[in-house]
Amino acid sequence: MSGNSAANAAALAAFNGIGKKKKESTTKLNGTDNNTNHLGVIGSTSNQTKQHQQQQQQPQALRTPLPAHPSRKKSNKFSQLKRLNTAPAMASLQPALQIASPSISPTQPSAPASALDSDPDYFTLSPHTIPSKNEIAKSPQTPQDMIRNVRQSIELKAIPNNAQAKRLSVDYSPQEMLKNLRHSLHSRTKTSPMLTTSDKMGQTMLAEMRDRLENTRRIASNSVASLSLSPNLDFNKSTSDVSNLSHHYDVDTVSTDSFASFNSSINDRHLPHGISIDVTNHDSDEDEIDDREREEDHEPLDNGELKSTNNKVTVSSRLRRKPPPGEDFQMQLNDKSRDTISSGSYSLNPDEVYSFTDPDSYENLVSEVEVGETTRLFPQFPDANHYHQHSSKFRKKHQKVKPINGIYYRDMDSSNTSDTEESTSNLPSRSTTPLLGQPQQQVHFRSTMRKANTKKDKKSRFNELKPWKNHNDLNYLTDQEKKRYEGIWASNKGNYMSQVVIKLHGVNYETQKDPKEEAKMEHSRTAALLSAAAVEDSNYNGNNSLHNLDSVEINQLICGPVVKRIWKRSRLPSDTLEKIWNLIDFRRDGTLNKNEFLVGMWLVDQCLYGRKLPKKVDNVVWDSLGGIGVNVTVKKKK
């Protein structure tokens, strides 16, 4: 049974290796020819021919007798496998073992066919003498073997993290590699070809340009240094101490402690103007070179070879463009040093010292300050006027400042200050201290001892930022508004009035008729004049003189379309303009006189300010057209 089971397993593996698509055969195998043909398909063609010849030569020795009644057995899968495996044919067993061997043990290769052929006992064994299942070599594909194989494959494919292996050259360290690279670069630079002629020409051109720039710089510095500051000031270099690198004006120095220089010279000659300015340079390294160059340039001047100013101008004119004066020159003109203000010292002659207690000396100083323009007074910074003050507690502290001759002084006669504020205003302050040379302000006395009612004045003021606030000027036309509206009236009155065909109120057409003009007029226009009539107002109040209803010249009226075009420029809605027209139109003939036009313009401006239109124009507005517009109320005596 053990031999049959091993044969069945080998045959099943061979059958699966041929192809899984084939279905189970339904025909019975009744002869040995079918068995040999079926097994011959599995083997190779060359081995099949050789084995077939051997079967023909020795059929009796290799074959075993078949059972007597093979047809009685059932044709199932296992019976077919038994029949195939029991065949002792040499050609049928060899390919079956070769096909089944890789499926059983893929890691260990099967024995070659030559080794099987060389075995003398292999072909003599019968199917029943095949080794048992235990005798077959076991497959090494256990889980431990599989894990071991996977580990070996991973270790072989892994890249070792070794710095020595990654280096291109293990023999050299990084320092040696850098040294070799430098050596190669130096060797290449030494072996490089010589400079071409073009490179040499470029170097020579650069050298020439540098020389030209240096010469121009020296000439410019000499020309600036040679310029004199003023006809009365001598700018000379101090010979007391060269290391100080300071330029002095040779004057009698009577310097103060706050503006005195530490390195100023004392033994100098006197000049009448009595001003000494010490300009010190703190940049020692750069200024030493400049001073040496200036000493070399000034050596021929000291020896007597003096040049005129004309020659200096010609030297500077040779430049293409004269350089602008530097910061040093500008500061020297302003009597200030370049580095620090404290380095300059301002002094006065003892004869020119003024005392504020002596009136004669003070008057002389005032006259000189008024005449002289070089003296610069310190500017005064007045207090800013704060318009938006929402608290009444702090309003009294802010006093208005009035300018007098360009200098601001506090108003000593302001009615807004109280007695306590007058006592505090006498204290010294920065903005109230008068400058020297300005006339003292005259003292003004109050006209009355009563205090002004500031609250009432503030209420009556007109705030331009809030024009909609209620004040007295909103009830009538002011003089400024009246003049502005009269200019518009004068430039537009009488325009297109000759084209009006409606009979107008107050116009005497009999005195103005011209027979020549009537003859030239068309018949349609004459008929319109005869048939048309003005609309009469039944609610007429009798203001004939105000609205010129009785008598008026045609040139003193303005046409309705002209008024419409003027009012349209205000960009008010047409409904609002219609209401304004109805409020002022007393003539009812499509025209307006001067008073009506002025009131209409005033109402347009009031609408632009944001006020609402009244239901009726007050008499105060109409009265303001003829006079100042001030209503005086007389109180009765008690």
UniProtKB/Swiss-Prot annotation:
Gene Ontology process terms (BP): adhesion of symbiont to host; cellular response to starvation; filamentous growth; filamentous growth of a population of unicellular organisms in response to biotic stimulus; filamentous growth of a population of unicellular organisms in response to starvation; fungal-type cell wall organization; lipid metabolic process
SMART domains the record matches: EH (SM00027)
Region (Disordered): 15-78, 270-356, 409-440
Keyword rRNA processing found: no
Bias type Polar residues, positions: 27-47, 306-317, 427-440
Superkingdom to which the source organism belongs: Eukaryota
Record key words, sorted: Lipid metabolism
Biased composition regions of type Basic and acidic residues, renumbered to the chain: 291-305
GO molecular function: calcium ion binding
A GO CC term attached to the entry: cytoplasm
Start and end residues of each EH domain: 539-628
Compositionally skewed regions (Low complexity) per UniProt: 48-60, 414-426
PROSITE patterns: EF_HAND_2, EH
Domain EF-hand span(s) in chain numbering: 572-607
Family to which this protein belongs: Belongs to the IRS4 family.
Chain's role: Positive regulator of phosphatidylinositol 4,5-bisphosphate turnover and negatively regulates signaling through the cell integrity pathway. Involved in rDNA silencing.
Protein name: Increased rDNA silencing protein 4
Organism annotation: Candida albicans (strain SC5314 / ATCC MYA-2876) (Yeast)
Annotated gene: IRS4
